[in-house]
């Protein structure tokens, strides 16, 4: 590490017995201390000028110096530490990370606090990308999961920042989040999203609604700053995987959904003698509500009350042809509930629609037992948790659907292996595409470098030949120079390609990239990462 003190450049290094004296192009003499460097050492009672590049000095492999970063005037030593590769976390490759909670890892009591309505997905992406180590982001929030997908400039720092963001937003302590969270990186994160899209990670194996929700993430993210190339590419590929798995394995044939499982659960919990005469009420006529109505009709229900904010959504339900649907506005919810035996709730309300005090005042249900049945598949829940304390009701939420799903799951487990094979193939394709992005800046700058040389030499040649050169000859000379440049570029660029169709590993390709960066001084390597983090730090100080 180098700092200027009275014309003397001082280098700090970690202790090592070996050292080859550096020969530098700096005009100032170099002094080397064999001691650990700390933030206070960066100040050295003088202005910090940067960090000395190990590439420019012949050194022992065990002598550690850090690469040069040209700093803006006025940055403090701490800011230098944040924005340079002295920070060990910035030496990592940019990572895809998923952080979240789902039905397998956390109870609904936690998930509902973290739930993010669709309207808040775009501003949520903006908040996440404003964090120092987050470059891109996406939000997937359903009744069964709340997952944040990010492109992190540093795994460790990125995870810390996103976890703190989730804690601040939900009011859940970080320690509690860490007990229940899903935390996956790169290939594992990619595989997880592909399994989610294929319906393999759903409460109901193979259910189709999750694919529509993944599609909605892409639709909502279009044009949102922060939903950029890597994250959008990941989600678009996940949609391809979801479609392919369903087409090639038929894993969704005859499949349950959360809505169908809710209807079946209600059927199981009702006394057999009351099933045919039970009065049914559905609260909400959105996607989930319409599916509940559809499955009620499939089970033989021909009359129900639907409570919703507007009547248009109720009228749009296709299953209305042979069914008597009685629409009631939301203001009549308690009056309708007093006459209902089974109540399904499936709205996006952030606050409970039924409290303990409300339900306690309702008359007994008309079933054999007199108990009113609530099936709440909303997250956040529409039925307050305290309602289950009442002896006159039975309350079930989305987590209680597991017992219904278990029997259905066995029939499709054989298809999971086929689906995993497809997912494995698609992971390889996606990672080849993602890895190819690593070398794109180098390829572009290398082409531009060669083009500048070609154009300059062409101008010299044409000027020497005089102004009276026939146009045909000029075109021929230009084409010749282009041909030579392209043939010279072909070999190196082929060794920078990462399309998954050759035997070169990513490490080999990255080594080739670093070599070309060094040879032609393209500076597209770690400096890109450093610039991104530095820019975020500086924006945060304004």
Curated annotation (Swiss-Prot):
Reactions mediated catalytically? (S)-4-amino-5-oxopentanoate + tRNA(Glu) + NADP(+) = L-glutamyl-tRNA(Glu) + NADPH + H(+)
Q: Which residues form a coiled coil?
A: none
Give the EC number.
1.2.1.70
According to its UniProt entry, the protein's GO biological process terms are: chlorophyll biosynthetic process; protoporphyrinogen IX biosynthetic process
List the SUPFAM superfamilies hit by this protein, alphabetically.
Glutamyl tRNA-reductase catalytic, N-terminal domain, Glutamyl tRNA-reductase dimerization domain, NAD(P)-binding Rossmann-fold domains
- Enumerate the active-site residues: 143 (nucleophile)
Residues that hold NADP(+) according to the record: 284-289
Q: Name one GO molecular function term.
A: NADP binding
Q: In which tissues is it expressed?
A: Found in all tissues examined.
InterPro entries in UniProt: 4pyrrol_synth_GluRdtase, 4pyrrol_synth_GluRdtase_dimer, 4pyrrol_synth_GluRdtase_N, GluRdtase_CS, GluRdtase_dimer_dom_sf, GluRdtase_N_sf, NAD(P)-bd_dom_sf, Shikm_DH/Glu-tRNA_Rdtase
Give yes or no: UniProt keyword Chloroplast.
Answer: yes
Keywords in alphabetical order, please.
Answer: Chlorophyll biosynthesis, Chloroplast, NADP, Oxidoreductase, Plastid, Porphyrin biosynthesis, Transit peptide
What this protein is reported to do is described as: Catalyzes the NADPH-dependent reduction of glutamyl-tRNA(Glu) to glutamate 1-semialdehyde (GSA).
Q: What else is known?
A: During catalysis, the active site Cys acts as a nucleophile attacking the alpha-carbonyl group of tRNA-bound glutamate with the formation of a thioester intermediate between enzyme and glutamate, and the concomitant release of tRNA(Glu). The thioester intermediate is finally reduced by direct hydride transfer from NADPH, to form the product GSA.
Q: Which family does it belong to?
A: Belongs to the glutamyl-tRNA reductase family.
Annotated protein name in UniProt: Glutamyl-tRNA reductase 2, chloroplastic
Q: Which organism is it from?
A: Cucumis sativus
